[in-house]
């Protein structure tokens, strides 16, 4: 009995089998994996939400900052 899960590649829609040895999963190939990465890098894909004002970000003082000041 074949219980392997079939999935569609999120980029091209090609049907493939979900296998632990598929280094590109959930994609069908390195090409589709790189296309997806490029879409995230170019901000064609993004997680919805409101933008953060850079002025409102609070930074913490870490040990490296103290070393540089001495």
From Swiss-Prot:
One Pfam family recorded for the sequence: YacG
Function: Inhibits all the catalytic activities of DNA gyrase by preventing its interaction with DNA. Acts by binding directly to the C-terminal domain of GyrB, which probably disrupts DNA binding by the gyrase.
Subunit and interaction comment: Interacts with GyrB.
UniProt-recorded Gene Ontology molecular function terms: DNA topoisomerase type II (double strand cut, ATP-hydrolyzing) inhibitor activity; zinc ion binding
InterPro entries: DNA_gyrase_inhibitor_YacG, Znf_NHR/GATA
Cofactors demanded by this protein: Zn(2+)
Domain of life: Bacteria
Cofactor remark: Binds 1 zinc ion.
PANTHER family: DNA GYRASE INHIBITOR YACG
Keyword flag Zinc: yes
Gene: yacG
Identification of the protein by name: DNA gyrase inhibitor YacG
Entries under HAMAP family matching the protein: DNA_gyrase_inhibitor_YacG
Gene Ontology BP, a term: regulation of DNA-templated transcription
Region (Disordered): 43-70
């Amino acid at each position: 009995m074949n219980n392997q899960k079939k999935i569609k590649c999120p980029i091209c829609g090609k049907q493939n089998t979900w296998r632990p040895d598929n280094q590109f999963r959930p994609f069908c190939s390195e090409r589709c994996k790189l296309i997806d990465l490029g879409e995230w890098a170019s901000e064609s894909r993004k997680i919805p939400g409101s933008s953060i004002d850079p002025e409102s970000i609070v930074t913490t003082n870490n040990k490296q900052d103290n070393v540089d000041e001495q």
